């Protein structure tokens, strides 16, 4: 629910009043679902899990060179 509101706010440049109205509408819909006895699923994490260790200097430079070569950018050799 929050993610949808946030995406809508960003995509449509909603003002505070519009966002509050849409949040109230979402809460009304959620209340109706609960009152009907519908089971509400557990929230799903949508943030990616960032893993791994940072690259060392040599690995970082190699990665930059790879990206430059892939896209044909100037200075492809490091």
From Swiss-Prot:
InterPro entries: P-like. Pfam families: Phage_lambda_P. Signal peptide: none annotated. Coiled coil: none annotated. One of its GO terms (biological process) is DNA replication initiation. Belongs to the phage P protein family. Encoded by the cryptic lambdoid prophage DLP12. This is Putative protein PeaD. It comes from Escherichia coli (strain K12). The lineage of its organism: Bacteria, Pseudomonadati, Pseudomonadota, Gammaproteobacteria, Enterobacterales.
């Amino acid at each position: 629910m929050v993610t949808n509101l946030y995406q809508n706010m960003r995509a449509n440049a909603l003002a505070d009043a519009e966002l509050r109205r849409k949040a109230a509408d979402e809460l009304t819909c959620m209340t109706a679902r609960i009152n009907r006895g519908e089971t509400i699923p557990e929230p799903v994490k949508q943030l990616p899990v960032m893993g791994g260790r940072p690259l060392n200097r040599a690995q970082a430079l190699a990665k930059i060179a790879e990206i430059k070569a892939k896209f044909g950018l100037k200075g492809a050799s490091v």
